[in-house]
Amino acid sequence: MSAKFGPAGNSEAFSAKYKTTLQAPGYLEAMGLDHYEYQCGRGVKVSDKIAFALKDKAKEHNITLSLHAPYFISLSSLEAEKRDNSINYILQSCDAASRMGADRIVIHSGSCAKISREDALELAKDTLTRARKTAVEQGFEHIVFCPETMGKVNQLGNLTEVLELCKLDDTFLPTIDFGHLNAREFGYIKGKAEYEKMLDEVENAVSYTHLRAHETSQDLV
């Protein structure tokens, strides 16, 4: 399997020398990297001008793109309105990703609220299924959904839960943030054996994935 490497957002080193994200593709190519994750964690606010320009720059410098959907998505909220809003945030992310030429969006699942993890997972499955159905209806069938592992115990998103979400649709792929998994398991990762165990679990569930090495702020696609 081929791999692509690149940052999620702009590093301090980049920001110290450059003024705009549109310069990121050239910067990454010069460093020997080939992927960039555009950050919409605080909301999807991407104009056509920026989206189309980034698409052109990424193509010029052989950089593939993904997009991180808003952090405030809550797939398993007890409030139906919040789940519906989460679907809208996902659709907004699909639209922005499509305009800039990205082929996948990274999705946080949110907290388990005051219900069991099993019930939260079922709500999340329903929300993601409805989001995918609407995305396809709106012409975003080419956008891959990538649920991400979460870093806090009260959040839905341990490795098993993320893999369960990805079984909903062939176009769903897990985003595995090892830093998050290590945090939620209180320093579980000690070395190679723990990584191998987690990767074996992923391999048994899906054949292709989106991995994030949290410590270096790099993505492995």
Where are these regions (language model features)?
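Hydrophobic faces of well-ordered beta-strands that scaffold small-molecule active sites
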Residues: 5-9, 36-38, 65-67, 105-107, ...
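Active-site glycine- and acidic-residue-rich loops that bind
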Residues: 150-161, 183-199
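N-terminal pre-domain/capping segments
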Residues: 1-95
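Well-ordered, non-membrane alpha-helical segments in soluble/globular domains
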Residues: 21, 124-128, 192-199
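Active-site acidic/histidine proton-transfer and metal-coordination neighborhood
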Residues: 59, 76-175
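Conserved small/polar residues in nucleotide/adenosyl-binding loops
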Residues: 209-216
